[in-house]
Regions:
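Short glycine-rich anion-binding loops that position phosphate/pyrophosphate groups of nucleotides
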Residues: 2-4, 73-77, 127, 152-154
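Conserved helicase motor
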Residues: 45-52, 125-127
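Alpha-helix capping/helix-boundary segments
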Residues: 28-30, 75-76, 105, 154
Length: 169
């Protein structure tokens, strides 16, 4: 889901109910989603910096012939999310990874932006400190629409920085 527990596909719910282990960023967030949809499965939290021993646990489950689902706190695993490290290591060990598409914040915002999105740039999350001004300089100098993710708590700060870098825009 992309911030609303109802933004989830029937297929995603089926996968979650049929898998043997659910890998998540934060068990508290995953438990809320699973509770809402009456799903009870073992959870393994792998936060921002994936610990090798936790990824080894995922590989052990896969080696035993079981199925693992990867979730994220909001959005799509691997898109500006720590899930990419898990996926990379699972693929490197020869396991097949299948995407389960669903709602996307990126697609949602582009659909209502009111600008030509034939071509655009996605930047992920801006750095918190070092490199922040450089990140936003690239944003204001872009000739195509730029989309990036950000916490609602930093939006005003971002707008102030953008205004100082490109007051004419």
């Amino acid at each position: 889901p992309i911030g609303n527990m109802e933004d989830i596909t029937v297929r995603a719910l089926r996968i979650l109910s049929e898998c043997d282990l659910i890998v998540c960023e934060d068990t508290r967030v995953a438990k809320k989603l699973l509770f809402k949809h009456n799903i009870s499965k073992p959870l393994l939290a792998i936060p921002q910096r994936a610990a090798d021993e936790k990824i080894r646990r995922v590989l052990e489950v896969l080696e035993a012939g079981k199925n693992v689902a990867l979730t994220t706190d909001a959005g799509t695993p691997g898109v500006s999310d720590p899930g990419n490290e898990v996926v990379e290591k699972v693929i490197a060990e020869g396991f097949r990874v299948s995407p389960v598409p669903g709602p996307s914040a990126l697609g949602a915002i582009l659909s209502v932006a009111g600008v030509n999105t034939q071509e655009f740039c996605f930047k992920g999350f801006p750095p918190h400190k070092k490199g922040r001004e450089t990140f936003f300089r690239v944003v204001v100098e872009s000739t195509v629409p730029v989309v990036y993710y950000e916490s609602p708590y930093r939006v005003v700060k971002n707008l102030e920085l953008l205004a100082s870098l490109a007051p004419e825009k």
